[in-house]
């Protein structure tokens, strides 16, 4: 399905037309398009044989010299080394004025590693596949918020969202970080506290009583969502509404409201769009048990991506399989093979 002509093939099949019967559209200058070297084309065709035909590789003759001209294979011991080598090759291209390069890979983890390596040199490179919404700050924050309440403020879930950059609970960000560190040292390490805010309050000592107001505020913020998650049957609209109310309250800082922090930037806009679509379709999904909401939210967010609109380097790119068939660069790197 990633082939550039897949859609045309499907159309011809539905129209019951043989591809050989399709006439060429007259186009002046079409003969001037450079022809692909036959040896290289044959090499790529043989390399991409379906799994059922790879046994024929043993009978294939060695590829001609022209097929291997300009090709280089780099074997790497691991994904980190592979990302480093690719980043160096991309960086080297920038030393030649006007030269372009692209990494082609179906491996999104490799793409993110390469982008991170390029960032060390201050080079922004766009991945056309985007970043999974769940791995962006707003997406992960929304997921952690529901996990926190569903998990009864368990230590692991509390620390995961407590150390998230968007979490402030209406206080200065630095002050909330200090609160989390103190709570971690005094209550969250050692024997597991009882579930809920009451369990955390019970673990406070005289020297940490000053943490109590923050915990009580968190209990008030989460009360609506907590009550719905414990219902055996509740509408998705109610759950999403309570979830977002809690997330926005948790994201608020002393000088900025929660919505302004949570929905800012491209990732925030993508998260807001996802929530809007979820609310639009919630009525058709009917009621569900509150305990299943967290899993449902994770599943629905899967596959959503945040794609950059602009800002990447004009001569470097990371392409998926379909984009690579439709574009050209002086240096093409195939990664994650």
Q: Residue ranges of each PLM-predicted region?
A:
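Polyanion-engaging groove/track-forming segments
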Residues: 1-337
């Amino acid at each position: 399905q990633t082939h550039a002509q897949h859609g045309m093939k499907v159309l011809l099949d539905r129209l019951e037309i043989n591809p050989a019967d399709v006439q060429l559209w007259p186009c002046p200058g079409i003969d001037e398009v450079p022809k692909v070297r036959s040896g290289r084309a044959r090499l790529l065709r043989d390399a991409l044989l379906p799994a059922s035909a790879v046994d024929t590789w043993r009978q294939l003759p060695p590829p001609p010299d022209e097929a291997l001209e300009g090709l280089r294979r780099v074997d790497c011991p691991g994904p980190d080394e592979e990302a480093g080598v690719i980043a160096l090759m991309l960086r080297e291209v920038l030393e030649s004025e006007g030269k372009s390069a692209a990494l082609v890979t179906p491996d999104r983890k490799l793409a993110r590693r390469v982008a991170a390596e390029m960032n060390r040199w201050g080079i922004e490179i766009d991945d056309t596949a985007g970043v999974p919404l769940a791995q962006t700050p707003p997406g992960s924050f929304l997921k952690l918020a529901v996990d926190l309440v569903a998990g009864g403020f368990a230590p692991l879930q509390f620390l995961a969202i407590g150390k998230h950059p968007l979490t402030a609970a209406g206080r200065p960000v630095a002050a909330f970080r200090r609160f989390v560190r103190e709570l971690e040292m005094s209550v969250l390490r050692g024997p597991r506290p009882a579930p809920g805010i009451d369990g955390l309050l019970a673990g406070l000592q005289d020297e940490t009583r000053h943490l109590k107001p923050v915990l009580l505020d968190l209990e008030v913020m989460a009360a609506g969502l907590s009550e719905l998650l414990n219902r055996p049957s509740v509408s998705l609209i109610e759950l999403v509404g309570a979830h977002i109310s809690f997330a926005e309250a948790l994201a608020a800082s002393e000088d900025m409201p929660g919505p302004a922090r949570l929905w800012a930037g491209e990732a925030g806009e993508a998260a807001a769009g996802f929530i809007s679509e979820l609310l639009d379709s919630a009525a058709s999904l009917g009621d569900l048990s509150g305990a299943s909401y967290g899993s449902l939210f994770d599943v629905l967010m899967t596959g959503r991506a945040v794609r950059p609109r602009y800002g990447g380097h004009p001569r470097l790119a990371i392409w998926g399989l379909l984009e690579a068939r439709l574009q050209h660069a002086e240096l093409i790197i195939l990664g994650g093979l």
